[in-house]
Amino acid sequence: MTAVHAGNINFKWDPKSLEIRTLAVERLLEPLVTQVTTLVNTNSKGPSNKKRGRSKKAHVLAASVEQATENFLEKGDKIAKESQFLKEELVAAVEDVRKQGDLMKAAAGEFADDPCSSVKRGNMVRAARALLSAVTRLLILADMADVYKLLVQLKVVEDGILKLRNAGNEQDLGIQYKALKPEVDKLNIMAAKRQQELKDVGHRDQMAAARGILQKNVPILYTASQACLQHPDVAAYKANRDLIYKQLQQAVTGISNAAQATASDDASQHQGGGGGELAYALNNFDKQIIVDPLSFSEERFRPSLEERLESIISGAALMADSSCTRDDRRERIVAECNAVRQALQDLLSEYMGNAGRKERSDALNSAIDKMTKKTRDLRRQLRKAVMDHVSDSFLETNVPLLVLIEAAKNGNEKEVKEYAQVFREHANKLIEVANLACSISNNEEGVKLVRMSASQLEALCPQVINAALALAAKPQSKLAQENMDLFKEQWEKQVRVLTDAVDDITSIDDFLAVSENHILEDVNKCVIALQEKDVDGLDRTAGAIRGRAARVIHVVTSEMDNYEPGVYTEKVLEATKLLSNTVMPRFTEQVEAAVEALSSDPAQPMDENEFIDASRLVYDGIRDIRKAVLMIRTPEELDDSDFETEDFDVRSRTSVQTEDDQLIAGQSARAIMAQLPQEQKAKIAEQVASFQEEKSKLDAEVSKWDDSGNDIIVLAKQMCMIMMEMTDFTRGKGPLKNTSDVISAAKKIAEAGSRMDKLGRTIADHCPDSACKQDLLAYLQRIALYCHQLNICSKVKAEVQNLGGELVVSGVDSAMSLIQAAKNLMNAVVQTVKASYVASTKYQKSQGMASLNLPAVSWKMKAPEKKPLVKREKQDETQTKIKRASQKKHVNPVQALSEFKAMDSI
C-alpha cells in the first residue's frame, strides 16, 4: 500500500491491487470478459477426430475481442490526456493494454487457425489473462483518478471549514461561509455519485452518513463561530464550536475512507453491521440444536450448546435487571430462561438415546420442537421487555429539553446545570433503549439506522447543553436565543429520526400489547390518586396517559400508511379517530375537573364514577385499536398471548375445562343428558344462550376489578364458575358427572352466597346513603332466594327408558329449571357487585376506610382476562387479501441521515 500526499491529500492506493471496488468498473469490464471467455471456451472439449481446418467461429470471436480492445484503448487515451491526476500511470496503463492486446491478437489468430492445438490454446489463455489484467488495471486507475478529483475537492472543503472556525471577525466569517457553501454543495454532488458506484454496502452507508453530518453541521458551525465572536467571554460557545468542528473533521475522514473503500478508524462505523446480538445468538442456537443422530457426540455437542445457551441467558438477565423492566416481566423472563435450560437438558437426553441411529425418533423430534418453542417464548418475553422500555422512554421526549430551555431563559445557571444532568440522563436512556431494541431485532438494515441515529443523538447532546449554558449566561441576547432555537430544532428532529427508526425494528403488535398494559397501570394510578386526593400525582399520571395515547395514534397511523386503503385501514383509522376525537377530550375534561375540584379550598365534591368511566374508555379505546390492527393477522402470526382458540361452545373463562368422556348410556347422568333428542337439546341450548347473556354481564363486571383484596369479586367468580359447570352438565359436558355432583355444587353456591350476604350486609350497615343501602340489601335478598331455588332444581333426575325399542331420555324440564335458576342467580350477583361498589364509594367519601374494621374490599381496576382478539376464519369463507401499497417505503438505511439540506441562510 502506498499513500500519496500530494498537496496534503491522503490518497491511499496499492498499485499492485486489482480489487474492483465500484460497479462502474464491473460494468465496463463485463463485455470484454464475456467475449474472451467465449473465445477461450471454443472447442474446449479437446482433440477431435474431425478434419483439421480453420474455425470461422474462432476467427469471428477473435475479431470481436480485438475490436473491444481497440475501444478500450481509444477511451483510455482520451482519459489519460484529459486527466489532471495520475497522468503518467494512466499513459503507462494504456500502453500496457495496447501491448497485451497485440499479443492477444497474435495468439487468438494462431488458435483460430488451429483450434484443436492444446499448446496454442494455452498460449491464448495466458494472453487473455494478461489482457484482462491490463484492462482491469487501466479501469481501476481511471476510477482512482476520479477518487483523487473528489479528494481534492474534499481538501478544499476541509480547508474552508478550518478557515470558518478560525475567522477573526464577523466580516471575515461571513466571507468564509459564503465561499464555503458552494464548495460543500459541489462536494456533496461528487460524493453522492461516488456513493452510488461503491460495491460495498458498508462503504455506501458510511459515505451517506458522513455526507449528512457535513451538510447539517456546516451551517451550525457558522452560527457557533458567530456566537463565539460576539460573546468571547462565554466558554460554552467555544466548547460548542469545537465539538461541531470535531464532528465535521470526522465527516471529512469518513468521506475520504468511503470514497477509497478503505476501513474506517471510527469504531462506531463497525457496530452498524448485522442484526442484534441476542437475536443472532438465538437464531444460531436454533440452528445448532438440529444434529444428525449418527454424528452426535455428547462430549462435543453438550458443552458447546450449554455454553451458547448460558451466553444467551446472560444477555436476557441483563435486560431483565434493567430499571424499566416491570417486575412481572422480569419474573417471566427468569421463568422462560429456566424453561429453556430444562428443555435443552431434555433434548440432550433424547440425542443420547438416539445416538448412532440413522433417523430421529418421534420423541427426539418432539424434544426439538419443544426446544424451539421455548426459545420462541423467551424471544417473545424479551421483545415485550424491550417494548416496556420503548413505551416508557420514548414518551414526552421533549419535556427534559423544554425544562432545560426554560431555566436557561431565566438566566439561572445553577438550575441549568441541574436540569442539564436530567437532560443528559434522558438522552442516555434513549440511546440505551435504542441499543436494547437493536439487540433483539433481526432487521439488519433497521438496526444499522437505529445505531447511526443514536450515535448522532449522542454527539448532539453536549451541544444542546452548551447552548443552554450560553443562553443562561446571556439570556437577553437575541443571538443566544436563536442559537438555542437552532439546537432545539436539531434535537427534536434527531429524536424523531431515532423514534421512527426504533419503531421500524420493533413489532407494532408488541408495542400495542405493552401500551395497553401500561395504560391500564396508569388508569389505576389515576383512580388511586383521585381517591387519595393527590393532585400532583393525578395530573402527572393523566399526562402520561395522554402521551401514551398520542404515541399509539401516531404509530398506528404511520403503520396504516404502508397499506393500500381499504376496509382494514378504514376500521383501524376509525378506531384511532374515536380515541383522539371523542375519548381523549372527555378524559381530559374529567381530569381538569378533578384537578380543579381537588385544588379548591375547601375541596369540591367530584363524581368518581364519571372519572372512572372516562378512564376506562381510554383503556377500551387502546384495546379496540389493537383489535383492529390484529384483524388481518393469521393465527400463526399471533403470539399465544394474543390469540386463544375459540371453542364452538361458549364456556366460562373461570370454569375448569375438561374433555368429554365417552358417552355410554347408563354410565352417568351427564352421559345421559348428552343423549337427549335434538329437539330437547335445542330447548336446552336456547336456555343456555339466555344464561350466557347474563354470564357475559357478570364477566364484564368482575373483569373490571382486581380480586386481590376484594372478597366480593372472589365470591362472584367462584359462583360464576360453579354455575357454568352446572349448565355444562345439562348439555352432557363439564366436570359434573352425576346428580350428586350437581347437588354438591349447589351447596357450594349456597355457601358462597351466604358469605357474600354477610359481607354485603356489613358494607350496607356502614353505608351513609340510605338509597344505596336499601338497593344492596334488596339484591342480597335475591341471592338468598335464588340460591334456595338452585338447590331445589339441582336434584336433576336423568333417566333412560326403553319404550317400544326406542331410548327415551327424561329430565329436560328439571334441566331447564336448573338453567333458569342459575340465570336468575347470575343476574342477582351482577347487581350485588355493582351495588357493593357504589355503597363502598359512598362510605369512603363520608368517613374514610381506615376507621372501619371491615374485611379488605379494595376496588382496584384490573384488565379483563384475555379474550380471543381475532376469530378464526372458516375454511370456506373467502378472505380478502390486504396488499401492501406499491409505494411502501423501502428506505435506504441511512437515507434519512443523508437528506439533511444545508440552510440557505442563517
From Swiss-Prot:
Pfam families: Vinculin (PF01044). InterPro entries: Alpha-catenin/vinculin-like_sf (IPR036723), Alpha_catenin (IPR001033), Vinculin/catenin (IPR006077), Vinculin_CS (IPR000633). GO terms for molecular function: actin filament binding; beta-catenin binding; cadherin binding; gamma-catenin binding; identical protein binding; RNA binding; structural molecule activity; vinculin binding. Changing S641A: Abolishes phosphorylation by CK2. No effect on phosphorylation by CK1. Residues 97-148 are annotated as: Interaction with JUP and CTNNB1. Residues 864-894 are annotated as: Disordered. Residues 864-880 have a biased composition (Basic and acidic residues). Keywords: Acetylation, Cell adhesion, Cell junction, Cell membrane, Cytoplasm, Cytoskeleton, Isopeptide bond, Membrane, Nucleus, Phosphoprotein, Ubl conjugation. This is Catenin alpha-1. The lineage of its organism: Eukaryota, Metazoa, Chordata, Craniata, Vertebrata.
